[in-house]
Amino acid sequence: LNIKKYNAPNLMSKCGGDMSRISDKEALNLIENEDLKILGERASAIKSELHPNKITSFCIDRNINYTNICWVDCKFCAFYRHEKDEDAYILSYDEIDTKIDELLAIGGTQILFQGGVHPKLKIDFYEELVEHIHTKYPQIDIHGFSAIEIDFIARISRITIKEVLERLQNRGLFSIPGAGAEILNERVREQVSPKKITNETWIEVHKTAHEIGMKTTATMMFGMTETDEEIIEHWRRIRDLQEITQGFRAFIMWSFQSSNTKLIEEHPEIKKQSANRYLRLLAVARIYLDNFPNIQS
């Protein structure tokens, strides 16, 4: 692969050169062998081709975790608590409002609103919560609830995923985040989060959201036990869905933070990911995910 000539298919009208879509094999070669400077230059060029005005945007937002109670027990997570733990919580409306007021004071426009997968909360709780926020703070975009939260709300409430999404959308939910994807490979998921939803269910939730006109983001957490091939499988799954729906507004990735997790106890060989590794994967993701308009960090 001559990376200096590579151009994504959706850039055909803007540039010349080899228009073929990058394959999994080519992506693996880039990860393993290509010079980081060349990767960065090509990824930056693709960004400039997609966004010729050379504007890089940002959003002032705030993470609000409405509960830390969760039954899924992911091995990579140091956040969750069980219902009877002393430091388990569900935020009150007043506590949520205080956090949003603090966000507004610094010019914020969005909340990333999610939590643990609470074993008892049903759709009515979430409808009332979203409606409260949207009614009191209509200027704030609610980017909330991961695919596993949506799936469990559907199951415990005995309704469909589509109904959950539509009901929350009607109350003010703007978009949903990509959390819960980690690595979309069943071997990895069985190892690090065996109680979590499957690849297919994560895809189904996002596809359903796109079908009702709700945008979402796609995410990836790397640096656990996955291989480079499994990272590329993850990218392929989200690229394939984007080809159908065009519903992802951005791709975001981050590295595994191992402190106080069960996963690092079970796999002490896991090493902290370097800045070079992050930049390498970020650049190849920009090249591979040719139908994603934005890479977010």
Feature map (PLM): residue ranges:
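Flexible, acidic/Gly-rich N-terminal and inter-domain linker regions that tether
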Residues: 1-72
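Alpha-helix N-cap and loop-to-helix initiation/capping positions
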Residues: 3, 91, 121, 125, ...
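Conserved short loop/turn motifs at secondary-structure junctions
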Residues: 27-30, 60-64, 115-119, 222-225, ...
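Amphipathic, non-transmembrane alpha-helical secondary structure
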Residues: 28, 37, 93-101, 105, ...
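N-terminal pre-triad scaffold of radical SAM enzymes
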Residues: 40-81, 88-114
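Active-site mouth loops of central-metabolism enzymes
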Residues: 62, 80-93, 149-160, 191-196, ...
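Radical SAM/AdoMet-radical enzyme domain recognition
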Residues: 74, 110, 123, 127-221
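Conserved C-terminal portion of the radical SAM core fold
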Residues: 115, 136-137, 169-181, 200-262, ...
